[in-house]
UniProtKB/Swiss-Prot annotation:
Classification via Gene3D superfamilies: 3.40.50.12240
Name the record gives this protein: V-type proton ATPase subunit B
Keywords per UniProt: ATP-binding, Hydrogen ion transport, Ion transport, Membrane, Nucleotide-binding, Transport, Vacuole
Source organism of the structure: Encephalitozoon cuniculi (strain GB-M1) (Microsporidian parasite)
GO terms, biological process: ATP metabolic process; vacuolar acidification
Binding site for ATP: R365
Any one GO molecular function term: proton-transporting ATPase activity, rotational mechanism
């Protein structure tokens, strides 16, 4: 029996035949395995980590996560480990800060792992997935009421350069929690965790997130993975996978409800393009590789819920659209994979509205399963539909006003414009530290809808109007 077992030793070589960007090319290598981890020892004694990206006979193409600067072709020793990249996991990752390669950078002790998990994730049986239900409350009215996020959903934030997507992400991390339900047995804060992955951010942004979480006290339930702008570009390819591996451990082994926020996915896609260019692959749109859709799906599809496990993974990736172009390959392909989007608008930002979320191009495809009686409130869906309708009509009336002038507007158009201005000022706009419950947000919405006569609220059933239309709003803290 033992004769059939072949133990392959760790092999070390000094056979680098070339370095191209973040890639190292080697030849005459035995026992090669695709995606196995590689350790590179430089002449000065420093050690870097890499991964086999391509195997062709005895040739290997290796991507080096810490970059290839300083690698001596003749003197660098390369050791093939025979193992895929794994990360040591423990519940102690919460409250800790890691760099983009998964090393602790907060000055604390190393994590004592309870398990080692492959960063590519475990293959999930599609039949075992549970449809996302039950809402995660972000405390932001425009998201909670009009683009509600379900546990296990993946919904990106489409932003652009210079817009406050970092502030929105930090606010969601600070305020996010499970909607309290009478029949829920796991709605305590102990069962809610946040995994935050930053790719290609500058030091100022990294310190902003770090200080924000520490000041609010939410750092204790948050694991941060920070890849800085001056860190190797190639490292950005593994940062989101490390973060999602931590999320999968917390969700499926520790049965926590995990919110994963990743910023900026545009930096990730640019790193993917850099590796593709170094491999001299045929480029696709805008120079991005043709397999970018498939690659992005290996990240986004790791959200969800599994039958027999109480935990869930909800993803909110953030990406900056180059030149505010929503047809750019990154937001375009992301929109195909994910279940909606939250759109951050530059014009609203210029009008000093925070958060500048434009609800009209925003969408949550799984919203209906997360709201309603027993989950949020029975008027939630109808109020959301009515807000959308009246806001869209108000936008049309505002455009008409710019053409014909205010004096030529009908009484209905003037009411619509009044609603639009109050809606943006009172409902969408809120403070950076303002946490609104779903009930508070819905009460504000009812207060705004009262500017219309009852017969103009044609998206809300009469029984809902009878119950809520005359109720005084609850004050917002």
């Amino acid at each position: 029996m033992l004769e059939s077992v072949r133990i392959e030793p760790k092999m070390s070589y000094r056979k680098i035949v070339g370095v191209n960007g973040p890639l190292v090319i080697m030849d005459n290598i035995r026992f090669l395995k695709y995606a196995e981890m590689v350790s590179l020892t430089l002449p000065d004694g420093s050690v870097r980590q890499g991964q086999v990206l391509e195997v062709s006979g005895k040739k290997a193409v290796i991507q080096v996560f810490e970059g290839t600067a300083g690698i001596d072709v003749k003197e660098t020793q390369v050791t093939f480990t025979g193992e895929t990249m794994k990360m040591g996991m423990s519940e102690d990752v919460l409250g800790r800060i890691f760099n983009g390669s998964g090393r602790v950078i907060d000055g604390g002790p190393k994590i004592i792992p309870e398990d080692y998990l492959d960063i590519q994730g475990q293959p999930l049986n599609p039949y075992a997935r549970i449809y996302p239900e039950e809402m995660i409350q972000t405390g932001i009215s425009s998201i909670d009421v009009m683009n509600s996020i379900a546990r296990g959903q993946k919904i990106p934030i489409f932003s652009a350069s210079g817009l406050p997507h970092n502030e929105i992400a930090a606010q969601i991390c600070r305020q996010a929690g499970l909607v309290k339900r009478k029949d829920s047995i796991d709605s305590s804060d102990d069962n809610f965790a946040i995994v935050f992955a930053a790719m290609g951010v500058n030091v100022e942004t990294a310190n902003f997130f770090r200080n924000s979480f520490e000041a609010s006290g939410s750092i204790g339930r948050t694991a941060l993975f920070l890849n800085l702008a001056n860190d190797p570009t190639i490292e950005r390819i593994i940062t989101p996978r490390l973060a999602l591996t931590a999320a999968e451990y917390l969700a499926y082994e520790r049965e926590k409800h995990v919110l994963v926020i990743m910023t900026d996915m545009s930096s990730y896609a640019d790193a993917l393009r850099e590796v593709s260019a170094a491999r001299e692959e045929v480029p696709g749109r805008r120079g991005y590789p043709g397999y970018m859709y498939t690659d992005l799906s290996t990240i986004y599809e790791r959200a969800g819920r599994l039958e027999g496990r109480n935990g869930s993974i909800t993803q909110i990736p953030i990406l900056t659209m180059p030149n505010d172009d929503i047809t750019h390959p990154i937001p375009d392909l992301t929109g195909y994979i994910t279940e909606g989007q939250i759109y951050v608008d530059r014009q609203m930002h210029n009008r000093q509205i925070y958060p500048p979320i434009n609800v009209l191009p925003s969408l949550s495809r799984l919203m209906k399963s997360a709201i309603g009686e027993g989950m949020t409130r029975k008027d939630h869906g109808d109020v959301s539909n009515q807000l959308y309708a009246k806001y869209a009509i108000g936008k049309d009336a505002q455009a008409m006003k710019a053409v014909v002038g205010e004096d030529s507007l009908s009484a209905e158009d003037r009411i619509s414009i009044e609603f639009l201005e109050r809606f943006e000022r009172e409902f969408i706009s809120q403070r950076h530290d303002e946490l609104r419950t779903v009930d508070q947000s819905l009460d504000i919405a009812w207060d705004l809808l009262k500017v219309f006569p009852r017969e103009m609220l044609n998206r809300i059933p009469s029984d809902i109007l009878d119950e809520f239309h005359s109720v005084a709003p609850v004050g917002v803290e």
